[in-house]
Design a protein with these regions (language model features):
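Structural signature of Gram-negative outer-membrane beta-barrels, strongest in the C-terminal barrel
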Residues: 285-287, 420-422, 428, 448-601, ...
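Outer-membrane beta-barrel translocator/receptor signature
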Residues: 159-164, 175-179, 184, 189-265, ...
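Transmembrane beta-barrel wall of Gram-negative outer-membrane proteins
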Residues: 225-256, 266-306, 331-342, 417, ...
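Membrane-embedded beta-barrel scaffold of Gram-negative outer-membrane proteins
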Residues: 223, 250, 352-370, 510, ...
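C-terminal beta-signal and adjacent terminal beta-strands/loops
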Residues: 523-526, 532, 604, 609, ...
Length: 793
């Protein structure tokens, strides 16, 4: 499935050339400046300023400038966001639990993984395996199978591979990111189908992230190095404004690291990886108010997943303690292409639209390099090892997902007296095609091939009266169709479909300036995934005895059963929130921002994997009879309702020379049928961030302390997460306008921490040591970096 390394190098070279192409000659720049002088009188700058003041739908450059001002003030809640209502508003003004991660924060923290960026964001966690560079995002205890809508430059990220890992992840290197918007809960239901947990919207870097005001071209070159173990990064991003109607931007990233040690000093095997990535964007403004952007993003991840045995495995006790897993040399390629057309003019109250077309491909090829025992010669041949679950050493398997989608929306505005009204309406469609290949293993059963189309349309009325009342009402229609196309093992043209209307209503008042309480009710709709619906066939025995023969003739430990009758999950979220926004609180120029939320999300028809009632099974293995109490069938079913409730707080005070912020989450989640806690809940997280700005703000020193409680209310057989206190230190120094030096220490206390619960064993009783051993985060990491800017007019 994957393309060769030559393609990777060629693409990265091309992107690098384009990004460095910003360093054009002085003659070309002079010509472009002359052309700009001819064009500018036709589109004077005062009109742009008027547009920004006239309505929130500002052009992207103005939004970037507004966000830059917010970043300089230290208030991420002053950033512009669109995820909650598809209309531009500052995060602090949104009547929704919205958080923003800025490029300034990313630059300060120098993260090697996305999870490092979300400690101070309430309600958000990441489930990382140390030997897998992809990321699974969890919002308010919901994750997997699309419960959180993840978009990169507007393109849905729906990749999913079932195994000893999260059922849904995505690939994105932090160095590529220009900003992140997070909306928690289904309050952003108009943003897209499936988001009963929330929306995570990632924006990759663009020309306004590199070029400064007045520059026609610019380049940022960055490099960093970290300990534990040889964490290296190099990147270059550059762009040129060819003329006032055309921008060209590109960049390339290379990252590498070796196996890290956890806080206990244990080296975590196969946690090293190599990542190469490149992006390209061309922006054209063919007419006043119109902007068309063509974007391309490519990422190449080379890594090894799986764990070697850590000791002898001669007895059941030693197997439980020391047995690893199969190991696979992995190469994942992620291709994303987008075309976006935006239009907005201040005098046009009828049209303010966005049209987005996108395609996303994840192509993950794996070759088995190690088996945890020497057994399997009957299946694999002399000198080889393996079993019929994971195949034999040297076998290949692959996971391919193609997603294509379109997202169209428009906002029309009208005023009636003191009532200011904005009607936003549109539709979105995406299609997933999954193709799984496994030469002798079980992956094509556990992650079946298939196709799914999900579509929806919405209308929203956002109305404001005077300066003290805001009401938002919305209605979304969702529809899905899913089929196996005859490709799933043991399934012949299984299909399912469904649809639903989901409402949203929000009411907010501002009785006094700066104080805005609000209440909200919103529903979200998540269609069943391909794997949940189509999984079918026998779970191979791994060389041991077989207990049951399935309908398709395969035999194994048990049979997976498809379920075309699965109903979609429906999230029903109740929210009470307060936004606080004050300036000049204690001293002139200081600012205080805060968002508080109380919520309860009732998820109806929650989908989970259910085992049949155990029965006695007689079997014969190697000529010896035996009897076992076995669950012969497993199937995804609508067996429970989930109730998740909690409190979130995000506060930030900035006095200019110093700043302090606290992000907190306290929540609980239950399967209401069994009254057992959900394994994906993180009960408590409090993160305090503070710092000072010295030397005329050239030097910033910041510390972050995350205090996290363990999740112990779990289904039977789960290994709890650990409680921990993670302390990080960051320093940024700008000796000149064009040079920025960064230093940091992650996990300065060198704590051992395992941030999420995992199953203690699989359904067949074998260990999940590969997941357990790779769950701990790195121990102490020292790191430093430099960014150099070049640019000119």
């Amino acid at each position: 499935m994957a393309l060769g390394g030559m393609t990777t190098r060629a693409l990265l070279l091309g992107v690098s050339i384009v990004s460095m192409g910003a360093l054009v000659s002085e003659t070309a720049l002079a010509q472009a400046a002359a052309q700009a002088g001819d064009v500018q009188p036709q589109k004077p700058k005062p009109a742009k300023k008027k547009r920004a003041a006239a309505k929130p739908a500002a052009v992207p450059a103005q939004v970037a400038n507004a966000n830059a001002q917010a970043s300089r003030s230290g208030q991420s809640l002053d950033e512009i966001t669109v995820t909650a209502s598809k209309t531009q508003e500052r995060a602090i003004d949104a009547l929704a639990p919205v958080s923003v991660v800025t490029q300034e924060q990313i630059q300060l923290q120098q993260p090697s993984r996305l999870s490092q960026l979300f400690y101070n964001v309430p309600g958000v966690w990441m489930q990382d395996r140390g030997d897998d560079p992809s990321t699974a995002i969890n919002i308010r205890g919901l994750q997997d199978f699309g419960r959180v809508a993840v978009v990169v430059d507007g393109a849905r990220q729906n990749y999913q591979r079932s195994g000893h890992n999260a059922n849904g992840s995505f690939f994105l290197d932090p160095e590529l990111i220009g900003g992140i918007d997070i909306t928690r809960g289904p309050t952003a239901n108009i943003y897209g189908s499936g988001a009963i947990g929330g929306v995570a919207s990632f924006r990759t870097k663009d020309i306004n992230d590199v070029l400064r005001p007045g520059e026609r071209w610019g380049v940022d070159m960055s490099g960093s190095y970290g300990s534990n173990n040889n964490r290296g990064l190099g990147s270059v991003f550059g762009g040129v404004r060819v003329d006032p109607t055309v921008d060209v931007f590109g960049g390339a990233v290379y990252r590498t690291q070796g196996n890290y040690k956890d806080g206990a000093g244990t080296e975590i095997g196969n946690t090293g990886n190599d990542i190469a990535a490149g992006l390209m964007k061309v922006t054209v403004r063919p007419a006043d108010g119109h902007e068309v952007k063509f974007g391309g993003l490519f990422q190449d991840y080379s890594y090894t997943i799986g764990q070697l045995n850590r000791g002898p495995t001669t007895t059941p006790a030693l197997i439980a303690l020391n047995q690893g897993s199969s190991v696979y040399a992995s190469n994942a390629k992620n291709y994303t292409g987008t075309v976006t057309w935006k239009y907005a003019r201040p005098e046009d109250m009828l049209f303010d639209f966005n049209v987005s077309l996108y395609g996303n491909r994840v192509d993950n090829d794996q070759t088995k390099t190690y088996h945890y025992s020497t057994a399997g010669t009957a299946l694999c041949g002399a000198g080889s090892a393996g079993n019929n679950i994971s195949g034999c050493v040297g076998d290949q398997r692959g996971y391919l997902l193609d997603t294509f989608g379109v997202d169209v929306n428009n906002t029309s505005r009208f005023n009636i007296g003191e009532w200011r009204n904005a009607v936003t309406y549109g539709f979105d469609v995406f299609n997933d095609k999954v193709k799984t290949f496994d030469s002798r293993g079980n992956s094509n059963i556990t992650t079946p091939s298939g196709e799914r189309t999900v579509s929806g349309g919405f209308v929203q009325l956002k109305t404001n009266y005077s300066s003290w009342l805001e009401v938002i009402g919305a209605l979304r229609y969702d529809h899905y169709e899913l089929n196996s196309s005859g490709t799933a093992v043991g399934v012949n043209n299984v299909s399912s479909s469904g649809d639903r209307l989901s409402p949203k209503i929000t009411l907010g008042v501002t009785p006094v300036a700066g104080f805005t309480p609000y209440v909200s009710y919103a529903e979200g709709y998540r269609a069943p995934s391909i794997s949940e619906t189509l999984i079918a066939g026998g779970h191979a025995s791994g060389g041991g005895p077989t207990f049951v023969t399935c309908a398709d003739g395969t035999a194994g430990l048990f049979c997976f059963l498809p379920n075309p009758n699965l109903r979609a999950e429906v999230g029903k979220n109740k929210e009470v929130g307060i936004n606080l926004k004050y300036n000049d609180v204690f001293t002139s120029g200081d600012s205080f921002r805060a968002k508080f939320n109380f919520f309860r999300n009732d998820v109806d028809d929650y989908i989970d994997l259910v085992a049949s009632t155990p029965v006695l099974v007689n079997y014969v293995f190697m000529g010896r009879p035996g009897t076992i109490l076995n669950s012969n069938f497993y199937q995804y079913q609508n067996i429970a309702n989930a109730k998740i409730e909690g409190f979130e707080a995000e506060t930030a005070y900035d006095a200019g020379l110093w700043f302090l912020g606290v992000g907190a989450t306290v929540q609980s989640g239950k399967n209401t049928q069994t009254n057992v806690g959900l394994a994906t809940i993180q009960p408590r997280k409090v993160t305090t961030t503070g710092g000072v700005r010295l030397l005329d703000r050239k030097l910033t020193i910041s510390a972050q302390w995350a205090s996290v409680a363990a999740n112990t209310d779990l289904p039977a057989g789960y290994v709890p997460s650990t409680s921990y206190d993670l302390v990080n230190l960051y320093v940024a120094y700008q000796p000149t306008q064009d040079i920025t030096l960064n230093f940091g220490v992650d996990n300065i206390l060198n704590q051992y921490y395992r941030p999420y619960a995992i199953p203690g064993s699989t359904s067949d009783g074998t260990t999940q040591n590969d997941a357990l051993w790779t769950a701990p985060g790195p121990g102490i990491v020292y790191k430093g970096g430099i960014k150099v800017h070049f640019g000119g007019a």
